[in-house]
Design a protein with these regions (language model features):
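Bacterial N-terminal signal peptides that target proteins for export
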Residues: 1-3
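C-terminal motif of bacterial Sec signal peptides marking the signal peptidase cleavage site
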Residues: 12-15
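Mature extracytoplasmic enzyme cores
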Residues: 20, 25-34, 42, 57-68, ...
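Acidic-and-aromatic substrate-binding clefts and catalytic sites of carbohydrate-active enzymes
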Residues: 48-57, 79-92, 320-324
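Second-shell loop/turn segments in exported
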Residues: 48-51, 83-86, 200-205, 290-292
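Hydrophobic residues within beta-strands of alpha/beta enzymes
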Residues: 73-75, 236
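Aromatic-lined carbohydrate-recognition surfaces of secreted/lumenal glycan-active proteins
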Residues: 108-116, 232-240, 292-324
Length: 324
């Protein structure tokens, strides 16, 4: 049941501090480091926790890592876990692993999620904060030459007038049964799954979601191992946080407001330019992508940066690639 992830994470010394000894650039010092590297120069594999986690299994895995010449480990919750994630038992076992690792000269890194992608805290974020997932995350386009009889399911309706589009969402009665080029946008939602604790993944662009995630995820670690933050608990690994669309254009509730504030014009009547190469589509697409990126930086990366700086923790991991 217990496995070590195939990919080994090699850690360098860039930005590392805490309990690590200062090095010099003398040849003799470097030669000694190559002969017997300190922990920050050694590999640190995933220490996968699944099934029933016990102190005996922790001892075995840490011994295997030490015998293999590793410098630390990332404790990684994975599918199949019986021990409840973020329970009192979970944190007690984590404390045991930290103490055992320190005794053996192995750094322990926190993995910030129950599997991946980071952000939902094993289902606790959507459970505590419904607005993190239930407002829609995408806009799916349907084009038609005649408005349907029922339009309630559409969030935005545009009509092409010459080389521009007019937002007629609140004036549909004037256009019923009138032929034209209509662009109908419907909200799409991230799908619910057992993987996310019966909920869905969350919208990391919604204000407060990352702060809720950090609070729910880290408060248990703060209670049990904070005294080792920046010491034997070296940092945090994040895994594939992302802002992918569940269908259509990526959207979030205050996208249009943030876009206008940043670029000085309204994105809504220009949504077709995100799909069609017409008009000033290159500028609009650039500004749209830049807005999403900046929202991700401001609402995901910066809260984590502040937390890690405040708590003397390093930050590593990898983001999910986007097909933009």
């Amino acid at each position: 049941i217990y496995t070590v992830a195939g990919g080994i994470l090699s850690l360098g010394t860039t930005g590392c501090s805490g309990n690590k000894a200062e090095t010099t650039d003398s040849f003799s010092t470097l030669e000694a480091q190559f002969s017997n590297p300190s922990s920050e120069y050694r590999t640190a594999p995933f220490m996968v926790w699944n099934g029933k986690v016990t102190e005996i299994e922790i001892d075995r895995m840490l011994k295997d890592f030490k015998d293999a010449g590793c410098g630390g480990a990332f404790i990684h919750p994975r599918p199949g876990m019986i021990t409840e994630y973020m329970s009192d038992e979970w944190y007690s076992l984590y404390r045991y692993a930290v103490d055992k690792g320190k005794e053996m000269g192995l750094d322990i890194w926190i993995y910030d999620e129950n599997s991946y992608p980071s952000g939902f805290a094993g289902g606790h974020v959507p459970e505590d904060m419904p607005e993190s997932y239930n407002q829609g995350q995408g806009l799916e386009l349907t084009k038609t030459d005649l408005l349907p009889d029922k339009t309630d399911e559409y969030f935005i309706i545009l009509k092409k007038e010459g080389d521009k589009w007019a937002d007629i969402t609140n004036a549909l009665s004037q256009h019923k049964k009138a032929k034209g080029e209509y662009y109908l946008y419907k909200k799409t939602y991230l799908g619910k799954s057992d993987w996310y604790g019966g909920y869905s993944y969350v919208d990391l662009l919604v204000p407060g979601v990352t702060e809720k995630f950090i609070d729910l995820t880290m408060k248990g670690y703060e209670k049990t191992i904070k005294d080792e933050f920046g010491k034997s608990v070296f940092g945090i690994f994040t895994d594939e946080p992302n802002i992918s669309s569940p269908g259509g254009l990526r959207w979030t509730p205050d996208l249009f407001e943030v876009f206008r504030k940043q670029w000085g014009y309204d994105l809504k009547p220009l949504l077709p330019l995100l799909d069609e190469e017409t008009g000033n589509w290159k500028q609009v697409r650039h500004n749209y992508m830049e807005t999403l990126l900046q929202m991700f930086v401001d609402r995901w990366s910066k809260p984590w940066h502040h937390y890690c700086e405040t708590n003397n923790l390093k930050w590593t991991g990898h983001y999910w690639e986007h097909g933009w």
